[in-house]
């Protein structure tokens, strides 16, 4: 099923603070993705933390890792059975997240 928290995204207009915190305090490599996003990595993954320069300081999304496609399908079915609408993301979104495939749903708080 889920093997790891792969990445997380936040909305914040305090990108300089995030650069200092993640870069200096956590030792993450800063990756300028252009546009409104700044990404950070700490290992061989393309990105682990993505900060979108938007008003507020809120969680935008979490990216969960699964071992195989079948696990993602099982997870989607469980979420649907629990009343959460699951959406198959398009390839453009998957590419922006540096993943092969992607589904998403909203949590009770709307994230």
Regions found by a protein language model. Give the residues of each.
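Short hydrophobic alpha-helix segments
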Residues: 34, 63, 89-90
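Short acidic/glycine-enriched loop/turn segments that link adjacent beta-strands
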Residues: 34-37, 58, 96-99
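Active-site beta-strand termini and strand-to-loop segments that position acidic
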Residues: 40-45, 53-54, 105-108
């Amino acid at each position: 099923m889920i093997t790891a928290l792969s990445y997380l995204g936040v909305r914040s207009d305090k990108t300089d603070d995030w650069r200092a915190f993640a870069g200096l305090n956590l030792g993450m490599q800063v990756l300028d993705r252009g546009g409104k996003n700044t990404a950070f990595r700490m290992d061989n993954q393309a990105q682990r933390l993505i900060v979108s320069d938007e008003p507020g300081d809120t969680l935008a999304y979490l990216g969960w890792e699964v071992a195989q496609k079948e696990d993602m399908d099982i997870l989607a079915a469980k979420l649907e059975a629990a009343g959460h609408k699951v959406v198959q993301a398009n390839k453009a979104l998957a590419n922006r997240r540096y993943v092969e495939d992607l589904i998403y749903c909203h949590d009770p708080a709307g994230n």
